[in-house]
Structures are given as C-alpha cells and as structure tokens.
From Swiss-Prot:
Cystine crosslinks: none
Identification of the protein by name: Small ribosomal subunit protein uS3c
Subcellular location: Plastid, Chloroplast
Similarity comment: Belongs to the universal ribosomal protein uS3 family.
One Gene Ontology molecular-function label: RNA binding
Organism the protein comes from: Hordeum vulgare
Entry GO CC: chloroplast; cytosolic small ribosomal subunit
Keyword annotations from UniProtKB, A to Z: Chloroplast, Plastid, Ribonucleoprotein, Ribosomal protein
Species lineage: Eukaryota, Viridiplantae, Streptophyta, Embryophyta, Tracheophyta
Domain KH type-2, chain residue ranges per copy: 43-139
Main localization category: plastid
UniProt-annotated stretches for the region Disordered: 50-74
Amino acid sequence: MGQKINPLGFRLGTTQKHHSFWFAQPKNYSEGLQEDKKIRDCIKNYIQKNRKKGSNRKIESDSSSEVITHNRKMDSGSSSEVITHIEIQKEIDTIHVIIHIGFPNLLKKKGAIEELEKDLQKEINSVNQRFNISIEKVKEPYRQPNILAEYIAFQLKNRVSFRKAMKKAIELTKKADIRGVKVKIAGRLGGKEIARAESIKRGRLPLQTIRAKIDYCCYPIRTIYGVLGVKIWIFVDEE
C-alpha cells in the first residue's frame, strides 16, 4: 500500500523525522499543536506580506545555463513557495524556530528577523517565552519538492503547457543528487471539461521500501479553469 499513504508519514521514525520537538501534558497537547500551526502560518504570512509586488528574481538553473525569471507576485495560496519546512523546538522559556528555506534573500535583510520575532510574540501572546529564530539555507534547492512545485505553479499560471512545465521541472533535478523523481498533475488540464491526471517519471521510485528516503509534497494551484493538484515524489537515497 505504499502508493496509498503519505510517503512522509509512512517513513516517520526511519528516514523522516518530526518537525516539532517538545513535551507536554496530555491535557495541553492540543494547545501545543495549535501553537505550532500559528507559528508556521505567521512565518508564511510574514514572507507573503513583505514580498515586493511584481518583482522579478532570476534563478540560475543548476541543470543548464538557462536563467529562469521567477515572478515573485503570488496569490494568497502560495505564501510558502520557498520554505521547505519549519522546525520548532520548545523549552521552558524559549521557542527555537529553524526555517529551512531555498532562497533566504528576504529574511536576510536588516531587521527582518527581529520584526518576525515581534510578530510571533504578538501572535502567540506569551509573556514567559521568547523566540529564537535561525535561517538554514537549503544547499540544493531543486532537490526539494516544494520548490519544484512552486516552479510548476508559476509556469501553469503563465499559460505554459502542463507537459512542458513538468519536463522543465524534471530537467532542474538532473544535476541534483537524487536517484529518481515523479511529477503528477491532476485537474482540468489544458482547460478541458473532464478532469484527468498526467504524470512523468525519471529514475527509480521505490515507494514500498521503508528504508528509501523519499521526499514528497502535495501542492494546490489556482488557475482560471479551477484548482489543479500537483504531487511530487523525489527518491533521494536508500539507507
């Protein structure tokens, strides 16, 4: 049943690890989960709010000399386009937040971290705890399924053919240190009235092997024809 379950949860404790590290009494556990969601949503909203509208950013592809012009103007559903994941570690008086991000230009600006910490403090409304935020840049951005999904979303919103967008996403992974990748898009592809699914695959993808380190993401894309769903599996290595 490897294809019927979330690949990340299926491998939790073996090749995947938790993104939240804290202990709580059973009666306070739900409050801790809600607090984690507020922290992650606040960080994503901060990045979306401070993004320059209509600005363009050039990303040089690792797989070729092609330079991709990446439009930063996103809708409200794409606020986390460069964040791969956020780790939260809680102590008695400190909440450590580690943001793993592909392109941390926005958060490297002077005063950005301090401003984000103030926003989090207001959101959580906790007097006894302070925030300690650190940024971790992802070494190989196009090895991350979230970033590839954002690239596909940008292409589809600009009326690029879905097959061409999938092939370009596969090309971006060619020089990344991975052993296999699969991209699947479902919905009203090309504006057709009947929804269908299309996929493209390169290399191996052993979904039923628990020791296989597989990264996965599911990403919704809002288009004029409705919502398209993008799923990306990346086979990194086998332990």
